[in-house]
Amino acid sequence: LRNLLKQDKERFAVPRGVQDVIPIKAIYDDGIFQVGRDKFSKTYKFSDINYAVASREDKEAMFLEYSELLNSLDSGATTKITINNRRLNRANFEKTILLPLKGDALDEYREEYNRMLLEKATGANAIIQEKYITISVCKKNVEEARNYFARVGADLIAHFGRLGSKCAELEPDERLRIFHDFYRAGEETEFRFDIKETRRKGHDFKDFICPDSMEFTGDYFKIGERYGRVLFLREYASYIKDSMVAEMTDLNRNLMMSIDVIPVPTDEAVREAESRLLGVETNATNWQRRQNANNNFSAQLPYDIEQQRKEMKEFLDDLTTRDQRMMFAVLTMVHTADTKEQLDNDTEALLTTARKHLCQFGVLKFQQLDGLNTAMPFGVRKIESFRTLTTESLAVFIPFRVQDICHTNGVYYGQNVISKNMIIADRRQLLNGNEFILGVSGGGKSFTAKGEVINQVLAGNADIIIIDPEREYSPLVRALGGEIINISATSPTHINAMDMNREYGDGANPVILKSEFIMSLCEQLIGGNNLGAVQKSIIDRCTASVYRTYQQNNYTGEVPTLQDFRAELLKQSEPEAQEIALAIELFTNGSLNTFAKHTNVNTNNRLICYDILDLGKQLMPIGMLVVLDSILNRITQNRAKGKNTFIFIDEIYLLFQHEYSANFLFTLWKRVRKYGAYATGITQNVDDLLQSHTARTMLANSEFIVMLNQASTDRLELAKLLNISDTQLSYITNVDAGHGLIKVGSSLVPFANKFPKNTKLYKLMTTKPGEGA
């Protein structure tokens, strides 16, 4: 340990320019920096996990796992854990999240949507929090350091993985960007660095990150026109809550908080603790001897000696029997502001937050430069205010708070309630991109679904298909230039149940798959009695026969209809064929023959809405089957073109009331992903939905679930199914419309989605009486 502390001491050279203030001596291609005579450092970035909203048991598990991580730190190296609040890079944000204008009629909506996104981005959440762990070690040369980091890095990544956090090493340009963004706040977009180019031209890498000027005074410093101050944790409370770090870094300013950890080898720690305990015991014995000399044989030991003895025994027990390690820790923090007045106010706010936790922060006097270099993730430590802690007491400074979801090219779903950051998610990046939107009536389900439809229509080139049983989507679909297909017995629009393209068969003969579909259809039409083997054979033979000409013409020309299929049945000699023909007559040549005619609507529009409000009870089961089959047709067609398809099914529980449509939907749910399609089920009747085993399986297998305000019985069912803690349940209990929980993969995040009311898009999305378009 003494050697390690000695290695941290370096001769102070008076900096002759701003470059000399930066303590990096050399940088290497793999992200290793030389930060001392023979000291090398490497930084890893790790993602946040849902600690703040986890249940008590989960928090304990995370705490113990984090303690394990601290225990695994090598005692021959110094570890620095840094939380960096950096300003949102506006240009990057605009490039990745704003919708590009396309010069068509929908541009007015794109501009409106972009205005809303910019308002959200420049509000309270203009700060992004990033977390790093920097390991620095003294080695003879960079090769030795490289081998060391390769070993330690793999271990570190595995430990973070067990916590549910992704950890990755930073490249040299990524590390330099951290310093550039801090030194040159407001110029984030101007960072350009190519290590090979720099080396070829003989440029100094420090020129790319250093500010124009730096000025250090007694208790603050100035970088360019900005002011900054470094604080350190002077006094620790006896009991600290695990939320302290999260609260300290909650300030909406550029700041960095670093915890330097120096693990002490356990044998040295035990020796030190034993000698301290021996000292306390000696004091106690001497005190007792003095009392005995005064004939005071019944005297009690003074409280302070008793307390010292108790604490030393506990400390020694921690080290020897409870698997704790002794650590030295230094906690430093640097924050910046535009004016001196603002800086003083921020300092006071931070000191007040610390006092709330009974800790005392102090301002570093005449050590601002050393403090700055310690707080930033260079891998150096110039501040000596050590505090001896055990693993457990150090783990209280847990750097985790809440997970943020920000995928590139994603859809905006609202703001994270805890971090106030935007939730931008892309279902295509998940293993299974199917989605459910659940919530009571008036909770904001349709609003959420419409928001997603709008984003997909305005942003990309994917096709969107909506099944609308309540006629809620018509104004939106019309405004976005989509096609509304009204389906009913009396409607002039028809969809041919036998429509089929060459991709329908998933690489095999499409007629085989279509034959299965027609069997389901006939079972449904005949009255739900299972078909016998003879009937199935007849249906299969007739299906192949009616499609023969269409297939021979290379899937061009006129597609056969159910009327052709019935005519083919009547040609067969078996009496069973005549029975089937008679049973389906009502739906082919009778008054419910809407699906037995050629399709006469444009099903090639990018945005299609199937309006099934007027579909009667008799037609509903067959209607749902035909619509779902028509969707499958479209999906397979799009797959061949390499195009995504998004399907939105409102009031999905209606489909589960009929066995065939439920099974067809289940198959669709499982298969659509490989076709590049993503299905969304929307319902308020979670209880009804979960009665169906099929629906239950679909919900459990969906990686993307938006839960809005829930009824009490539904809440309990969802908590059981998705393992939601009581803390998390509070976000879907009696909350306003548009508030709830969003499950993205393994992340569960509380969100709020407030859309500006004075916009055209709001009027198209809302279903509140009197507010709609």
Model-flagged regions — what are they?
Residues 445:
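Conserved lysine of the Walker
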Residues 722-773:
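Conserved P-loop NTPase
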Residues 49-50, 56-75, 86, 249, ...:
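P-loop NTPase motor domains
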Residues 448:
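Hydrophobic positions on the alpha1 helix immediately C-terminal to the Walker A/P-loop
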Residues 1-400:
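Extended, folded cores of ATP/NTP-driven motor/assembly subunits in large transport
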Residues 481-485, 694-707:
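A short helix-turn-beta junction within AAA+ P-loop NTPase domains corresponding to the substrate/partner-engaging
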